[in-house]
């Protein structure tokens, strides 16, 4: 099958001069090595390829474009293909909100031993920008980058010369650097002290909350980016983790510690998990460790998001919620269900500063 891929069972049986049912049984007994395509032909999984291109009609690729591309192709975490190509098209820039999800998806695929390639051949500018963001420092070493993986960047040099970009920093329980402090320093350098303490606090809470619900060996990360949009400066902060996710770790604690909340949001009802996340953001107090032991982080984050008139989106394994704040209060909330699989918690925090 290495020389002649995509053969049907009867064709393989004919070549080997054996019964077709023997071939079929062998193939189904070894699905970790073989896969059947849409034409019922069999091939080695490592030769079965899926390409996902993150296309966008405008300049910036956002998390919405990422989600549309996954909806179009399906999550590669659920597909039968052993070889996944994630492609960045020409003449497009990648916002951190999209870069974080591409990075998380690639690392999750590498964790399950898929052959993964990131294709920047049509967009060297995006590759260069993401290099400055330390994207490739966070990328699993087994992932191939086209046309080639950049050499390691000079961390101190980038930190000193890039005030509008905080590179994707690892979230570690015992790290060399305090990530929220690094955000605050960069924010003050670029924009003065306005809102710097609020940003520091909200991101500290979000990062702490993600750490509490992680339970994974894949390192999480956070980053801060600013860009000009229609006469104002837009700030995008991301916190991304590939663990179990907030909802998955809260659920087991509800029946034991918060039965009234469990009754309010039964898993059998549609959108129940999304509503649970919104409830935690608005009311706080929920913790996998029980009452009075943490659980205030999401509510505190919501309060500071309101003070910044921010938009917050929280992506879980198969759904997301979005909370939009105006006039320092929650203006609206929404959710999207049935999203393609992406493990963990992926938070995007956006707000504007008028010049």
Language model features by range: what are they?
Residues 209-253, 258-259, 333-336:
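ATP-lid-like helix-loop hinge signature
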Residues 93, 181-204:
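Conserved short strand/loop->alpha-helix "switch" segment adjacent to the catalytic nucleotide/phosphoryl-transfer site
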Residues 47-78, 140-142, 248, 252-259, ...:
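Flexible, glycine-/charge-rich segments associated with ATP-binding catalytic modules
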């Amino acid at each position: 099958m290495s020389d002649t891929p995509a053969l049907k069972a009867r064709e393989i049986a004919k070549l080997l001069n054996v019964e077709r049912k023997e071939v079929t049984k062998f193939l189904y007994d070894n699905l970790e090595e073989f896969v059947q395509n849409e034409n019922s032909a069999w091939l080695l999984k490592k030769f079965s390829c899926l390409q996902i291109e993150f296309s966008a009609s405008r300049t910036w690729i956002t998390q919405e474009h990422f989600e549309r591309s996954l909806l179009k192709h399906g999550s590669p975490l659920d597909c039968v293909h052993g070889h996944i190509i994630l492609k960045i098209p020409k003449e497009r820039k990648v916002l951190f909100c999209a870069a974080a999800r591409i990075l998380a998806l690639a690392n999750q695929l590498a964790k399950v031993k898929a052959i993964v390639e990131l294709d920047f051949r049509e967009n060297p500018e995006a590759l260069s920008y993401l290099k400055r963001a330390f994207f490739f420092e966070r990328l699993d070493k087994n992932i191939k980058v086209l046309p080639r993986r950049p050499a390691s960047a000079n961390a101190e040099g980038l930190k000193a010369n890039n005030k509008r970009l905080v590179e994707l920093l690892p979230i570690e329980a015992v790290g060399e650097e305090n990530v929220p402090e690094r955000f605050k320093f960069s924010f003050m350098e670029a924009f003065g002290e306005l809102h710097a303490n609020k940003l520091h606090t909200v991101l500290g809470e979000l990062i702490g909350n993600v750490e509490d619900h992680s339970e994974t060996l894949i390192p999480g990360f956070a980053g801060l980016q600013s860009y000009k949009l229609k006469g104002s400066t837009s700030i995008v902060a991301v916190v991304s983790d590939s663990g179990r996710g907030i909802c998955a770790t809260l659920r087991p604690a509800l029946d034991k510690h918060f039965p009234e909340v469990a009754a309010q949001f039964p898993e059998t009802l549609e959108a129940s998990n999304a509503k649970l996340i919104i409830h935690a953001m608005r009311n706080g107090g929920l913790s996998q460790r029980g009452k009075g032991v943490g659980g205030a982080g999401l509510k505190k984050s919501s309060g500071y998001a309101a003070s910044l008139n921010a938009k917050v989106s929280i992506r879980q394994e198969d759904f997301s919620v979005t909370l939009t704040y105006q006039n320092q209060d929650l203006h609206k909330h929404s959710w999207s269900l049935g999203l393609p699989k992406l493990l963990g918690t992926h938070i995007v925090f956006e707000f504007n500063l008028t010049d």
